[in-house]
Amino acid sequence: MARYRCCRSRSRCRRRRRSCRRRRRCRRRRARRSCRRRYSLRCCRRY
């Protein structure tokens, strides 16, 4: 399964992987929504 991490933008995720590692994980859809609401971050797939 692909692991998800929360990042501010997808472009940053693809370019800088380190920025994603420190962010929280978001596997399920609930986690993805919580990232957007609480931290106002978007989830990116690869890190």
UniProtKB/Swiss-Prot annotation:
Gene Ontology CC entries for this record: nucleosome; nucleus
Domain of life: Eukaryota
Gene Ontology biological-process entries: cell differentiation; chromosome condensation; spermatogenesis
GO molecular function terms listed in the Swiss-Prot or TrEMBL record: DNA binding
Keyword tags: Chromosome, Developmental protein, Differentiation, DNA condensation, DNA-binding, Nucleosome core, Nucleus, Spermatogenesis
Compartments where found: Nucleus; Chromosome
Expression (tissue specificity): Testis.
Major localization listed first in the record, in broad terms: nucleus
Protein family: Belongs to the protamine P1 family.
Role according to the record: Protamines substitute for histones in the chromatin of sperm during the haploid phase of spermatogenesis. They compact sperm DNA into a highly condensed, stable and inactive complex.
Name of the featured protein: Sperm protamine P1
